[in-house]
């Protein structure tokens, strides 16, 4: 079906009634890590949970880059109204030219990286568009669209807020799966709460999988290698090889049974 709010879509979607349609749903953070783009790349359609509850000092507004002393935070200052349930799509940027500090930190730490000049000008152009009164979500989505393009991630992306689907947690996820005709749902590995709601998905005819991703190691500024920085780190260091490197960390998705067993093992070892 045609869905409103399409941000990007160069991959052909399944058209037959019997074909499997795999989707993923996740909040669009600031300058996400490699695993976020791997999740997008594995599915037929990706729903950006832009109206989820905003959490202060979360990945919604910050991420990390590699510096000579380790991983360094870059945080977008926002107007936090403090009310329970403030949706991400309503959060506004607070400070003018906050991006100057971000760009300076990036330039200091990546200025000598092999592919710095290939990506920095476009990054700068995007960041400079946003200031007080602008929405954090618009900044995040602009960066995600650009980064996805550089990584050759072609999955169509849709803002969940445009779907008109209400509900909470798993119930809303199931409703969105049904709306777009999904047969399979690929979840971030961290969303283990879904293990308690598998029956809801099964009743809707949706099979649940969990992402299996091991951060790939590559030549990085300021050894030793540190994983889980923004995907900018990969692009600045490896350039056109970045997409292939990103996908090299992908494993066969976990089943709920495998995730439950792994979680039980972790709890037993504590």
What are these regions (language model features)?
Residues 3-270:
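Residues lining hydrophobic/aromatic ligand-binding pockets adjacent to catalytic sites
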């Amino acid at each position: 079906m045609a869905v409103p709010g399409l941000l990007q879509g160069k991959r052909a979607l399944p058209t037959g009634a019997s074909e499997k349609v795999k989707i993923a749903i996740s909040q669009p953070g600031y300058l996400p890590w490699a695993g976020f783009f791997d999740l997008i790349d594995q599915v037929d359609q990706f729903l950006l949970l832009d109206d989820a509850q905003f959490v202060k000092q979360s990945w919604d507004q910050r991420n990390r880059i590699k510096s000579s002393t380790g991983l360094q935070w870059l945080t977008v200052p926002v107007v936090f109204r403090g009310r329970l349930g403030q949706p991400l799509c309503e959060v506004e940027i607070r400070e003018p030219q906050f991006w100057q500090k971000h760009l300076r930190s990036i330039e200091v730490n990546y200025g000598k990286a092999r592919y710095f000049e290939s990506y920095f000008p476009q990054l700068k152009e995007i960041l400079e568009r946003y200031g007080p009164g602008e929405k954090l979500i618009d900044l995040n989505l602009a960066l995600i669209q650009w980064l996805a393009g550089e990584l050759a991630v072609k999955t169509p992306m849709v803002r969940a807020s445009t779907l008109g689907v209400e509900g909470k947690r798993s119930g809303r996820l199931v409703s969105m799966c049904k709306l777009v005709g999904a047969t399979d749902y690929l979840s971030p590995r961290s969303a283990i709460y879904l293990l308690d709601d598998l029956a809801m998905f099964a009743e809707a005819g949706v099979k649940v999988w969990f992402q299996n991703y091991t951060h790939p190691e590559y030549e990085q500024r300021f050894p030793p290698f540190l994983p889980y920085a923004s995907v900018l780190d990969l692009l600045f260091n490896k350039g056109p090889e970045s997409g292939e490197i990103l996908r090299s960390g992908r494993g066969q998705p976990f089943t709920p049974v495998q995730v439950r067993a792994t979680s039980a093992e972790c709890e037993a070892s504590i």
